[in-house]
Amino acid sequence: MTKDILILAVETSCDETSVSVIKNGRDILSNTVLSQIESHKRFGGVVPEVASRHHVEGITTTINEALVDADVSMEDIDAIAVTEGPGLIGALLIGVNAAKALAFAYDKPLIPVHHIAGHIYANHIEDLLTFPLIALIVSGGHTELVYMKDHLTFEVIGETRDDAVGEAYDKVARTIGLNYPGGPQVDRLAAEGEDTYSFPRVWLDKDSYDFSFSGLKSAVINQLHNQRQKNIPIIEANVATSFQNSVVEVLTFKAIQACKEYGVQRLIVAGGVASNKGLRQSLADQCKVNDIQLTIPSPKLCTDNAAMIGVAGHYLYQQGRFADLGLNGHSNIDLEEYSAE
């Protein structure tokens, strides 16, 4: 009988302290998440120093809870996986140092994991990844299209040239007057409104898979500013609907076109914005029309969590891609450089 592989995974790249135990690359034995949303809400966004302080306060408890929930001990664990980047450097270092301490104390291999690779592998938990595939990455810090021909091979074929889609959502939400985190609230409002504004769709160069959302963001901000200056009533739901339709149309079109050009019949979506209902429905509709298999994780697996890090860590473990105790956190890591090829 093949021995089960247990990975203890740590994720502290931004404002969630999360620890998970993953068995054999898919089974979640535990996935403890300590959220900081309430602490950052009054600031209208994540404050790095506050995030780091909360990670320091919560990391030990979160590790212990994950082990208890999984009903395992550190002696049962085969390796420690940890997000090394990208992310907030102070936050990353809390998780990296905790993982290094565990690896040293219990003599376990240490596995560095790229945060975006983790988001991609969140899909594998509920629906086995099959290759080749196109991954659409949509989050607060990233908007990318990635071609994968096998496990841990990443070719970035498109990325944002300015704002990430999640960043645009948060800025538009603040302009409308919605509380942090704004993305889910814009999505909720968008379901109630009508597309009454002609906000731009930015396609960039012909056949380009890059994205740009700064122009759209500015168009929304300027529109609301002009209406307020002229005392013209603002129907917030209509603003949200018009903005979201512009975003979703571009994301959907480019993702489907990438699948067609690369001859791929599998599209996966990853990142916090993957929980957006408007985007999920648009992609589902177009994938059905184009006979493309679509996988989007459950909303709880779209946001930052350690389970996704553990799944990616499992495949890195199988490839023997370990780090020594000199491992550091990195605010920026190129996904292609992290690729197995």
From Swiss-Prot:
Annotated binding of substrate, by residue: I137, V138, S139, G140, G141, D170, G183, D187, N276
**Top-level taxon of origin:** Bacteria
Q: Where in the cell is it found?
A: Cytoplasm
Instruction: Indicate the enzyme's highest-level EC class.
Output: transferase
Family annotation (Gene3D superfamilies): 3.30.420.40
Q: What is its EC number?
A: 2.3.1.234
Query: Which PROSITE patterns does this entry report, sorted A to Z?
Result: GLYCOPROTEASE (PS01016)
GO biological-process terms attached to the record: tRNA threonylcarbamoyladenosine modification
InterPro entries in UniProt? ATPase_NBD (IPR043129), Gcp-like_dom (IPR000905), KAE1/TsaD (IPR017861), Peptidase_M22_CS (IPR017860), TsaD (IPR022450)
Gene Ontology cellular component annotations, sorted alphabetically: cytoplasm
Look up keyword Lipoprotein and say if it applies.
no
Cofactors (names): Fe(2+)
Gene Ontology molecular function terms on file: iron ion binding; N(6)-L-threonylcarbamoyladenine synthase activity
Q: Where are the transmembrane segments?
A: none
Q: How is the cofactor bound?
A: Binds 1 Fe(2+) ion per subunit.
Q: Which reaction does it catalyse?
A: L-threonylcarbamoyladenylate + adenosine(37) in tRNA = N(6)-L-threonylcarbamoyladenosine(37) in tRNA + AMP + H(+)
Q: Where does Fe cation bind?
A: H115, H119, D304
Key words, A-Z: Acyltransferase, Cytoplasm, Iron, Metal-binding, Transferase, tRNA processing
Q: Pfam families given for it?
A: TsaD
**Which HAMAP family does its entry note?**
TsaD
Q: What does this protein do?
A: Required for the formation of a threonylcarbamoyl group on adenosine at position 37 (t(6)A37) in tRNAs that read codons beginning with adenine. Is involved in the transfer of the threonylcarbamoyl moiety of threonylcarbamoyl-AMP (TC-AMP) to the N6 group of A37, together with TsaE and TsaB. TsaD likely plays a direct catalytic role in this reaction.
Per the similarity annotation, which family is this?
Belongs to the KAE1 / TsaD family.
Q: What is this protein called?
A: tRNA N6-adenosine threonylcarbamoyltransferase
Q: Please name the taxonomic classification of the source.
A: Bacteria, Bacillati, Bacillota, Bacilli, Bacillales
Gene symbol of the encoding locus: tsaD
